[in-house]
Amino acid sequence: MVKVIASSVRKGNVLDVDGKLYVVLTAQNFHPGKGTPVTQVDMRRISDGVKVSERYRTTEQVERAFVEDREHTFLYEDAEGFHFMNPESYDQLVMSADDIGDLKAYLQEGMAVMLSIHEGIAIAIDLPRHVTLEITETEPVVKGQTASSSYKPALLSNGVRTSVPPHIQAGTRVVIATEDGSYVERAKD
């Protein structure tokens, strides 16, 4: 464990609060006109997923847990969870669907991901910034419809809905941002 000042806490850090591990969801520094500056930290307890909000004085010491980020390859999903393999040691780790959250829709077999590991347990996952998916369903474009928004709804091959430009048709492969599920560009493959 490493002690750091609260103002240096960032999203994705893992904190040890009263012997329990929390992953930081957001951390904002506030400097009110009067009084001491504070850092508002929203966290999720790793053991059970409970969300907690804490306020620390910006100079207050908090314990940051030692977490190692290692590249792993996504293998498959089964009733046990999502299976990942370390390409160097061939060790396998399993993460539950709750730990992965909404990112599970973007996981593809063979995809390289970064796992945050604390004492041999995967506690967080970081996907590539972009994934390539196929459009399975989209509305036909209406000619002359330039006055309204230039994007139309589309359904991706992973079941996620997004908005795409009018020239994109069903069957087209597109690049999607994993952070928010937004359209980036047409795939170049």
From Swiss-Prot:
HAMAP family: EF_P. Keywords: Cytoplasm, Elongation factor, Protein biosynthesis. GO terms for cellular component: cytoplasm. The keyword Protein biosynthesis applies. Transmembrane segments: none annotated. Belongs to the elongation factor P family. InterPro entries: Elong-fact-P_C, NA-bd_OB-fold, Rib_uL2_dom2, Transl_elong_fac_P/YeiP, Transl_elong_KOW-like, Transl_elong_P/YeiP_cen, Transl_elong_P/YeiP_CS, Transl_elongation_fac_P. It holds the Pfam family EFP_N. The gene is efp. Disulfide bonds: none annotated. Involved in peptide bond synthesis. Stimulates efficient translation and peptide-bond synthesis on native or reconstituted 70S ribosomes in vitro. Probably functions indirectly by altering the affinity of the ribosome for aminoacyl-tRNA, thus increasing their reactivity as acceptors for peptidyl transferase. The keyword Chloroplast does not apply. Pathway: Protein biosynthesis; polypeptide chain elongation. Its main location: cytoplasm. GO terms for biological process: peptide biosynthetic process. The lineage of its organism: Bacteria, Pseudomonadati, Pseudomonadota, Alphaproteobacteria, Hyphomicrobiales. GO terms for molecular function: translation elongation factor activity. It comes from the Bacteria. It is found in: Cytoplasm. This is Elongation factor P.
